């Protein structure tokens, strides 16, 4: 019985230590999420305005153009956005599963550019090759990081090595809801886009388009990185809160078992003492 008490006591101590860690990590994730949401909200106005401008710009492009009509390549690029660290619930698995599900439809003509350590690990285990890997993205992504990724992807597109650029990321909706999105950013989706003549271009738009597309793609990547980081921290906060709750439930159960065994041991000792005293009469 004493051995059983010692074992339970050790488990209680171990789970208590684990709870301290999960609680601390949950608090850190909450703080980091607050910053991530602030950055996302600050960028939203610029991103939305730029999206509207790009629709007008793309509608004003004259004749055949690779950014509106495609470049003839069958290869599709998928840029997947995962985290560098773990312990964030199903965040990484959901992104990779969505990417793999889409890629499996035409694996022969699909290429992967992985953002985040976890994505790289997932694809390696699933035996999917990647053409580029970007890791150690900051919790507060920078335009420089977005530019590095977007320039690489755009270079491949301009050279005709890929015919589509798709981003697979987790869109932040709220602390408890994030949606996995697969968005094609190039070539532009011209459906329902018509030139309304509200913008005049000087010089002609076809002379400006390559530079505009570079800025547009960087803006897209930056927005997706911000969404991804906010989603990551929300998932981590939820996972750590759940782990802390589970630890509390385990501790309640173990403490109850410990007290029952201890009470039983004390009762047995009292019974033995009383029995011994009775025997001596």
From Swiss-Prot:
PANTHER family: ATP SYNTHASE GAMMA CHAIN (PTHR11693), ATP SYNTHASE SUBUNIT GAMMA, MITOCHONDRIAL (PTHR11693:SF22)
Record's subunit section: F-type ATPases have 2 components, CF(1) - the catalytic core - and CF(0) - the membrane proton channel. CF(1) has five subunits: alpha(3), beta(3), gamma(1), delta(1), epsilon(1). CF(0) has three main subunits: a, b and c.
Location in or out of the cell: Cell membrane
Record keywords, A-Z: ATP synthesis, Cell membrane, CF(1), Hydrogen ion transport, Ion transport, Membrane, Transport
GO biological process: proton motive force-driven plasma membrane ATP synthesis
Name of protein: ATP synthase gamma chain
Matches recorded under InterPro entries: ATP_synth_F1_ATPase_gsu, ATP_synth_F1_gsu, ATP_synth_F1_gsu_CS
Taxonomy, superkingdom: Bacteria
NCBIfam families noted in UniProt: ATPsyn_F1gamma
Gene Ontology annotations for the cellular component aspect, listed alphabetically: plasma membrane; proton-transporting ATP synthase complex
UniProt GO molecular function: ATP binding; proton-transporting ATP synthase activity, rotational mechanism
Family of the protein in this entry: Belongs to the ATPase gamma chain family.
Topology within the bilayer: Peripheral membrane protein
Subcellular location, principal: membrane
General function of this protein: Produces ATP from ADP in the presence of a proton gradient across the membrane. The gamma chain is believed to be important in regulating ATPase activity and the flow of protons through the CF(0) complex.
